[in-house]
Amino acid sequence: MVSESITPQQWISYGITGYRELVYNPGYDQLFAEEIDPALSGFERGTLTQSGAVAVDTGIFTGRSPFDKYVVRDDKTRDTLWWSDQGKGANDNHPLDQQTWVHLKRRVGKQLSGKRLFVIDAFCGANEDSRLRVRFVTEVAWQAHFVKNMFIRPSDEELRDFEPDFVVLNGAKCTNPDWREQGLHSENFVAFNLTEGIQLIGGTWYGGEMKKGLFSVMNYLLPLKGIASMHCSANVGTDDDVALFFGLSGTGKTTLSTDPRRRLIGDDEHGWDDDGVFNFEGGCYAKTIRLSPEAEPEIYQAIRRNALLENVVVRADGSVDYDDGSKTENARVSYPIDHIDNIVKPVSRAGHATRVIFLTADAFGVLPPVASLSMEQAQYHFLSGFTAKLGGTERGVVAPVPTFSACFGAAFLSLHPTAYADVLAKRMHAAGARAYLVNTGWNGSGKRISLKDTRTIINAILRSDIDDAPTATLPVFNLTIPTALPGVNGAILDPRTTYASVDEWRAKADDLAQRFIDNFSKFTDTPAGVALVSAGPQR
C-alpha cells in the first residue's frame, strides 16, 4: 500500500530530494524478512532468536543521548520551553539556532535522499481529539519495526488520507562534522523544531530516541491545552476505577501496576483530558536485564514473533542470555501492547483516575510504607520525584544514593515542571482523585519492605480501605500515615518504630528532609513553586 497523501511538496519540506523505493507501512511479515536479510550488515542486520523475536544492536548508543538533545529556540518556544540555560533546574532542552537547524536538516535529508525508504504513519495518543499523527521516515527496517510496535497503528482507512502533524526523520547513519564550530556537544544529534513539526536524528541508533522524542513533543503540546501529560503506568479495575502509578526505575512501578484483577491501560506514557486517562502508545518498551519467566511472566511471554529485542546477548543456538549485561544494563524489548493478555480493549483508554500513587524506594529508611497526601503535598512529591538506591562505597560500606527527577521524568519535560504539577492537580481535583505516597524501600530494620506488604497496601488504596483507617502524623515530613491496615503488620506503618530509638530515625529524617529542601529550591523560580514549599518537609 502506497499513501497517495505523501506529496512531492512534502518530500521537499523534509529535505529529501527523491528516493529509490518507498516501502510504506509494511506489515510485520515483510519487516521480519527485511531486518534479517543476510545481505545486511552492521547495526542494520537483526538476528533471529529462539523465541521468534528479532534481536538488534545499537552500538555504543544503548540509551538516550541527553547532551545531544536540542530544540530550536524561536518565537514559538522562546517563552514557553523549559530551557537548559534558564532557571535553576538542569534539563536536556539545549537551545539550537535556526541556522544550525537548517544545516542538520540538510545533513539528514542528504542521507535519506535516493535511498530505499521505510515510512511508518502512526498515531501518538489513544484519544482522537488530542492524538498526534506522526510520520516516521528511515532507511533501516528494524527502526520501522520499532515504531510500528511502539505507536498506535492506524487502520487502512485512516491511512488513506493521513496528514502528519509531526515528522521524525531518522538519519542514524549520518553525523555532523561541524559540531565544534557550531558549539554543539558532539557529532551526534537529536534535534526538534516544534514550529516545523520535525525531529531529526543523526549518529545514534538507539530506538528509544524516537519513542521518548515523541513523549517530549506531547509533553510540550498537551499541558498548554490543559491536558495532563504523564510518565506513569495506568490500570483499571472491574468497577472502572482507574489508578495511576508514578515511579522511577527500581520502585516497582511495572510490578505493582501489573495485576491479574485489573486491566492494563499502558505501562509508560499517558494523558488525562476531559474524557479520562489514555495511553500515548500502542506498545511496550520493557527492560530485559535479568528477565525470567518466574519474576515477570507477562513480559517474558510477550517476547515472541513481532517483538524486537535491543542489545541483548544472543547465544550461538539463538537463545538469549538475559542475565548477561555485558552490552548494557539497559537491554530492552519492544512489542505491540496486544502481546499482553489483560489489557484495555479495543482502545487503550479509560475514565478518570480516582487513585494516584507515587512510588519511592527510600534506601534511607525514613519514609513510611504509605501516606495519604493533600493536594499540595501531592504536587510537592510529584515535583520532587524522589527515590534512593543502595550503592557501595570504596570501603564496601553501603550508603543510600538519592535521586530526584521532576515529575518522575525530568529528562522528557518540555515545560517548567510546575506546569505539569498544576495540570495534574486540576485533573485530580475535578475527578475527586486522592494521592498516596508508597515506599517500597527500606526501614529501620535494615530490611526492604516486603512485596507482600506493599501489594496489600496497594490493594487497600485501590479498595479505599485506607481512607477509613486510623491515622497519625509523621513529623518532619508532616505525612498522614495509617496506624493500622488489614493484612499489614502495624509495627512497620510508622517508620519510627522500626528503629532502636526515635532519635535515630529523627537524625536520618532531618538529613533526608534537607535533601528534599535543597532539591526543591530549583522550583522556587516560579510563584507556583514558592507556594508549595510549605507542603514539603520542615526542619
Swiss-Prot record:
It comes from Sodalis glossinidius (strain morsitans). ATP binds at residues 212, 231, 247-255, 296, 332, 448-449, 454. This is Phosphoenolpyruvate carboxykinase (ATP). Keywords: ATP-binding, Cytoplasm, Decarboxylase, Gluconeogenesis, Lyase, Manganese, Metal-binding, Nucleotide-binding. GO terms for molecular function: ATP binding; metal ion binding; phosphoenolpyruvate carboxykinase (ATP) activity. It is found in: Cytoplasm. It is an enzyme of class 4 (lyase). It comes from the Bacteria. Coiled coil: none annotated. Belongs to the phosphoenolpyruvate carboxykinase (ATP) family. GO terms for cellular component: cytosol. It catalyses: oxaloacetate + ATP = phosphoenolpyruvate + ADP + CO2. Its cofactor is Mn(2+). The keyword ATP-binding applies. Binds 1 Mn(2+) ion per subunit. HAMAP family: PEPCK_ATP. CDD domains: PEPCK_ATP.
